[in-house]
């Protein structure tokens, strides 16, 4: 548990020990707060000589106090990383209500919308996010962010900006996309070039914060328009996102995506994120933080135009599923997997399925001790001539069906550390390999097992160290 700093202790005292504040100290505090907030104080004295604020100034004072409490609460959140040490928003608001700093209605408004307006000033406690769209109909004919007036396939341009530019949710062709329905984030659409396809703007006062679920967010855009232009993607705040599955899926019109501004530190699933992006030739994932990601299945499946994928920044120590990760990347020539930690991966099925242009894959750092499924892993990898799987330890392996089917140029497979004791499904594992292939195995036991399943390959199977 992190140690509390002196600043943290001061904040706690400020937040929790207010009963001892004297009237004089309170007045001084209020005046200081008002000076800091740029509020001019107008006062009158009654017959008892007690200083009284005008009603307007009282409200301004109250707004300043609430704003100060908000700032202290946020600062405390930055100092203490542990939730158990932070004062929850509910407790802060209960205390402020008890002290008559806010009303019951204002407390409820903050809990529901994340903000409150006092003396004409909006005080934001929680920015909120845009709506989640994973439950929408996300085909090309589906709505976009809840708007049923436009189809995803008819959108030709997305512009993400950091100002509302005077737009209101009640404006024609404008709608509120904030999860709290407080107008924090808006979207509007127009047809500037009169071609019956839409330019959509997503806006907020500041960066647009995505929902925890960004699932299917940009799916199937531009399908009918025949193009999709994405501007201002760096204005998306992805810091709270946990689910990016199928975020750009079926984006057949995407050609270049620079996602280097994405904060992915909380993301747990990226399954199918670029699934079916058949025209994508370049994707920049340089700053991706994948330390919490568990699922990478189908990540690039169907990205048939891409030739190079650089995953140097990927930390995969918590990933369990890599099913179809590069499946159907027919033009993929180079993929860098040197940063991969695969110690927890149980499923590598179809990982390189139909990667017809790959001539070499470096597995030197792969740990396959947890892997159960290697089924279809290299199906139709027609340019591979050699596979060095010498560090594959497979004590938990269950399924190797059609593992090398269609690898018609493969002359050597080194599996000198693999064991097949638990394998239950092995059909067609070696069936389509060339007749002169050499398969290196660990010992006579593994040779006997493979030979018994594939007797026509008996002469091709060699024990390591033996000629």
Where are these regions (language model features)?
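N-terminal leader/signal peptides at the extreme start of proteins
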Residues: 1-19
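N-terminal single-pass transmembrane signal-anchor helix
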Residues: 19-42
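Small/polar residue-rich beta-strand/coil "junction" motifs that cap repeat-based extracellular fibers
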Residues: 38-52, 403, 426-431
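Membrane-proximal N-terminal amphipathic helix
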Residues: 49-83
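Non-cytosolic, low-complexity segments of secreted and membrane proteins
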Residues: 53-55, 88-90, 129
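Extracellular/periplasmic head regions of type IV pilus-like filament subunits
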Residues: 74-122, 126
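Low-complexity, S/T/G/P-rich flexible repeat/linker segments used as non-globular hinges
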Residues: 124-134
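Negatively charged
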Residues: 134-467
């Amino acid at each position: 548990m992190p140690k509390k700093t002196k600043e943290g202790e001061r904040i706690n005292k400020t937040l929790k020990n207010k009963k001892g504040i004297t009237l004089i100290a309170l007045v001084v505090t209020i005046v200081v707060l008002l000076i800091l907030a740029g509020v001019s104080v107008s006062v009158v004295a009654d017959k008892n000589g007690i200083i009284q604020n005008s009603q307007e100034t009282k409200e301004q004072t109250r707004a300043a106090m609430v704003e100060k409490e908000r700032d202290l609460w946020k600062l405390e959140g930055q100092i203490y990383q542990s939730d158990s040490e932070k004062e929850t928003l509910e407790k802060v608001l209960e205390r402020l209500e008890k002290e008559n700093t806010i009303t019951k209605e204002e407390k409820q408004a903050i809990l529901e919308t994340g903000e409150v307006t006092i003396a004409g000033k909006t005080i934001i406690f929680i920015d909120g996010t845009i709506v989640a769209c994973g439950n929408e109909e996300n085909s090309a004919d589906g709505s976009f962010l809840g708007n049923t007036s436009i189809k995803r396939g008819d959108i030709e341009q997305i512009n993400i900006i950091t100002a509302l530019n005077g737009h209101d949710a009640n404006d024609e062709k404008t709608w509120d996309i904030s999860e709290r329905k407080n107008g924090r984030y808006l979207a509007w659409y127009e047809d500037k070039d009169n071609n019956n396809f839409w330019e959509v703007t997503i806006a907020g006062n500041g960066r647009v914060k995505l929902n925890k679920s960004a699932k299917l967010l940009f799916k199937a855009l531009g399908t009918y328009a025949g193009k999709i232009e994405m501007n201002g993607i760096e204005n998306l705040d992805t810091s709270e996102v946990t689910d990016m599955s199928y975020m750009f899926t079926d984006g057949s019109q995407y050609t270049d995506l620079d996602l280097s501004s994405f904060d992915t530190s909380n993301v747990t699933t990226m399954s199918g994120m670029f699934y079916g992006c058949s025209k994508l030739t370049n994707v920049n994932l340089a700053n991706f933080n994948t330390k919490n990601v568990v699922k990478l299945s189908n990540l690039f499946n169907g990205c048939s135009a891409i030739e190079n994928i650089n995953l140097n920044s990927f930390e995969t120590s918590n990933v369990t599923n890599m099913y179809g990760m590069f499946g159907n990347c027919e033009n993929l020539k180079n993929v860098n997997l040197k940063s991969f930690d695969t110690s927890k991966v149980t499923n590598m099925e179809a990982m390189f399925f139909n990667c017809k242009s790959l001539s070499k894959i470096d597995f030197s750092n792969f740990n396959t001790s947890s892997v159960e499924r290697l089924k279809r892993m290299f199906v139709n990898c027609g340019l591979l001539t050699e596979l060095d799987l010498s560090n594959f330890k497979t004590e938990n392996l269950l399924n190797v069906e059609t593992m090398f089917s269609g690898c018609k140029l493969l002359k050597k497979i080194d599996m000198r550390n693999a064991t097949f004791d638990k394998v239950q499904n092995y059909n067609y594992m070696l069936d389509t390999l060339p007749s002169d292939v050499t398969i290196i195995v660990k010992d006579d036991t593994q040779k006997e097992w493979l030979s018994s399943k594939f007797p026509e390959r008996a002469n091709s199977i060699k024990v390591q160290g033996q000629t």
